[in-house]
């Protein structure tokens, strides 16, 4: 028995691949990885001991491209698919798991050509174009969101690494705010943090700001100009995000699916600012259910005024009829919304098929 994991491009897809690879390793099952030279795949897995072999193809996405660039991307995808077909055959792969993203294309189609069972994890509430096409052909489609289109859909807990559960706690007061710009940085969140920093620090609220490597120097300069650089924690990125989340009492974040469910597992109340240009507005739909259940606050990017933060803080500090702060109630309910061992459930479901 030997698995192939494929897909990625961004941290959200890759974090799922990592969680599944860790579970395969725990169960003593060998796995290889197939991704792309474009995006973050190599950064995550080029030297990863989780895989016996790693392959990266020269491929790019097709969505939001001009006609001629789409043709070129499709050609690269097809070329890589035939290479992937030989690789899967060489390694005698018995199962393929796609975590989505354009880099999943070659190995997914190669699996179908080789008649290898294909399993998909759809991380978002709105399917990407590749997963929409492949879902009816897959053995199973795992997701934490309910879908009604064609395909054998299996509702599972999101495959969040156990460290997020292990560092969870129920919040009781807001002493520390985390601004999470994501691996690629988020200009709107970075500006929101800078605009609110003077008032927050004056009120004695600690700030941790992860701004993304491309924005670090500029953001650092502005904190220095504000005279706040020595009063806040600023990082381009952080290798121990679970510890950072553990210390925070409130978070401001984009609404990529992995971030949403990691924050949920940690019990960290969050203000989500969905990326408005995400395909099919999927970031908004990722948190729609949370918003309906009063488990988060969603602020459209075009409404992101500094006063919004303090409006949310006031609401979180209000008490319900039982005398519990909204902050504490939300924090506790978040931890109940997601079950541990999502990756284990997915792997065991595949093995029992």
From Swiss-Prot:
GO terms for biological process: carbohydrate metabolic process; cell division; cell wall organization; lipid glycosylation; peptidoglycan biosynthetic process; regulation of cell shape. It is found in: Cell inner membrane. Gene3D superfamilies: Glycogen Phosphorylase B. It catalyses: di-trans,octa-cis-undecaprenyl diphospho-N-acetyl-alpha-D-muramoyl-L-alanyl-D-glutamyl-meso-2,6-diaminopimeloyl-D-alanyl-D-alanine + UDP-N-acetyl-alpha-D-glucosamine = di-trans,octa-cis-undecaprenyl diphospho-[N-acetyl-alpha-D-glucosaminyl-(1->4)]-N-acetyl-alpha-D-muramoyl-L-alanyl-D-glutamyl-meso-2,6-diaminopimeloyl-D-alanyl-D-alanine + UDP + H(+). SUPFAM superfamilies: UDP-Glycosyltransferase/glycogen phosphorylase. InterPro entries: GlcNAc_MurG, Glyco_trans_28_C, GlycoTrans_28_N. Pathway: Cell wall biogenesis; peptidoglycan biosynthesis. GO terms for cellular component: plasma membrane. It is a peripheral membrane protein. Keywords: Cell cycle, Cell division, Cell inner membrane, Cell membrane, Cell shape, Cell wall biogenesis/degradation, Glycosyltransferase, Membrane, Peptidoglycan synthesis, Transferase. UDP-N-acetyl-alpha-D-glucosamine binds at residues 10-12, 124, 183, 283. Its EC number is 2.4.1.227. It holds the Pfam family Glyco_transf_28. One of its GO terms (molecular function) is undecaprenyldiphospho-muramoylpentapeptide beta-N-acetylglucosaminyltransferase activity. The keyword Chaperone does not apply. Belongs to the glycosyltransferase 28 family. MurG subfamily. Cell wall formation. Catalyzes the transfer of a GlcNAc subunit on undecaprenyl-pyrophosphoryl-MurNAc-pentapeptide (lipid intermediate I) to form undecaprenyl-pyrophosphoryl-MurNAc-(pentapeptide)GlcNAc (lipid intermediate II). HAMAP family: MurG. PANTHER family: GLYCOSYLTRANSFERASE (PTHR21015:SF22), UDP-N-ACETYLGLUCOSAMINE--N-ACETYLMURAMYL-(PENTAPEPTIDE) PYROPHOSPHORYL-UNDECAPRENOL N-ACETYLGLUCOSAMINE TRANSFERASE 1 (PTHR21015). This is UDP-N-acetylglucosamine--N-acetylmuramyl-(pentapeptide) pyrophosphoryl-undecaprenol N-acetylglucosamine transferase. It comes from Helicobacter pylori (strain J99 / ATCC 700824).
């Amino acid at each position: 028995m030997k698995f192939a994991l494929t897909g990625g491009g961004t941290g959200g897809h890759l974090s799922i691949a990592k969680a599944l690879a860790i579970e395969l390793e725990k169960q003593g099952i060998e796995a290889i990885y197939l991704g792309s030279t474009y995006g973050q795949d190599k950064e995550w897995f080029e030297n990863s001991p989780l895989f016996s072999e790693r392959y990266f193809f020269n491929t790019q996405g097709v969505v939001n491209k001009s006609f001629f660039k789409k043709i070129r991307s499709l050609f690269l995808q097809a070329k890589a698919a035939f290479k992937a077909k030989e690789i899967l055959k060489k390694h005698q792969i018995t199962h393929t798991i796609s975590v989505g993203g354009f880099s999943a294309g070659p190995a997914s189609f190669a699996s179908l050509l080789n008649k290898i069972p294909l399993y998909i994890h759809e991380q978002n509430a709105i399917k990407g174009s590749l997963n929409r096409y492949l879902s009816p052909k897959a053995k199973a489609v795992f997701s934490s969101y309910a879908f009604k289109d064609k395909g054998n859909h299996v509702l599972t807990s999101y495959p969040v690494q156990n460290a997020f559960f292990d560092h969870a706690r129920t919040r009781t007061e807001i002493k520390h705010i985390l601004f999470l710009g994501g691996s690629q940085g988020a200009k709107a969140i970075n500006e929101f943090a800078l605009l609110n920093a003077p008032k927050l620090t004056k009120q004695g609220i600690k700030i941790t700001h992860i701004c993304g490597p491309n924005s670090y120097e500029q953001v650092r300069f502005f904190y220095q100009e504000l005279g706040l650089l020595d009063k806040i924690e600023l990082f381009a990125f952080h290798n121990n995000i679970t510890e950072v989340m553990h210390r925070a009492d409130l978070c401001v974040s984009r609404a990529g699916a992995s971030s949403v469910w990691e924050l949920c597992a940690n019990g960290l109340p969050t203000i989500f600012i969905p990326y408005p240009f995400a395909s099919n507005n999927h970031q908004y739909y990722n948190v729609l259910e949370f918003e309906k259940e009063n488990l988060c606050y969603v602020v459209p990017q075009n409404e992101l005024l500094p006063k919004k933060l303090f409006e949310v803080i006031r609401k979180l500090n209000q008490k319900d009829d039982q005398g519990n702060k909204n902050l504490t109630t939300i924090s506790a309910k978040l931890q109940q919304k997601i079950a541990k061992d999502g990756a284990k459930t997915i792997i065991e479901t595949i093995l029992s098929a």
